[in-house]
Amino acid sequence: MADKSLIVLCDGTWQDLNQPFPTNVVRLLEAIAPQTKDGKDQIVYYDEGIGTQQVSIEPSLIDNLIKVAGGALGLGIDHRILKCYRFLCLNYRPGDSIFLFGFSRGAYTVRSLAGLIYNCGLLKSEHVRMITHAYSIYRKPNSDKERAPSGSEAIAFRKKYAITDRPDGRPRIKFMGLWDTVKALGIPDAPVLRQLSKNVNKHYEFHDHKLSSIIDAAFHAVSIEEERSTFSLIPIDQLNTTNCGCHQQAWFPGGHGAVGGGEASVAPLSDCALQWMFEKLDQNDSGLHFDADRIQMSFGPNSKHEINKGKFRIIETITNFLGKKRRTIPIHADVTPKSIASEVISDTALERLHGVKGWLPPSLHDFYLRKKLGNRWDNLLSELQEVATSLKL
């Protein structure tokens, strides 16, 4: 059998194929061809977003509340990770290429999936019933070194049950594409729920969303303007700092939906983040064959848009109650157009900054201020902290 590509796409919260306007995950799915030009199969697995479970044929108010709660708390993510993992275990063969894409909590799902693969490898088909055991190893307590990826139990598990086309029993992940990863589990980190979230969320800390050595290329489009505490960003902190062009986190204008799609009103912005991902696939010679002409796109870095407007009044009410939290852009982010640095302000944001009068969202304003002040900013913060301590604030 010829080598093939296995493509896992996990959609955003409350998003599925029935939505009136597709997310970038769905638009990418629509653009992927069944085969490459040289006849290599491209097999797609799509997982709808968290909180999309149909409770009943004619959902009541209570059913809709359950659906909203499921999306807000990330209920069911373990089941979704296992479904994606099972798909890969049943279909992967040595020589195949693996691609992972996700938006919102779907991005968190594929990052956790990559963590599971890094820990346990992919199981041989005759050992597929060991999936739950693999997950139990992955769910190790942080202090259990034996179950860590380099621990003796994890190594022994991979050697006995995983496909061993590589010495370490782990397949490579060719490309990971992400749109605005947000915290997927537990109580939102909102001011009014801070102590409760701290106590509850510690039970979900086992998820490994770090960028491991098995991932060849990873690209993450993140929102500059999103401030809802229920959409707290999970950035990639382990980016390759050698500017190899194979890992990058780029900051885009607009809120959560303006980066990952799913809202017609911000399509000109979200299409920019989608086109950026297409370009990164090409630049990294990913081998994934897609036809962007199969989907209609409209680019508008300078388009008008409203952010943080929920599709449903109940969702908007809840998110407003839970408060806001401004995102912090790392001071080392490059502001050079077409940069291949590991952290950048996107070309879309740079164009908007110069093309839309008065557009300078708080997070971007703070970033430029910190960048201009440099070490003086850190010194100022230290002095303010000393004053606060002396006044016992």
Annotate each predicted stretch with a short phrase.
Residues 1-393:
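Active-site- or binding-pocket-proximal scaffold segments within functional domains
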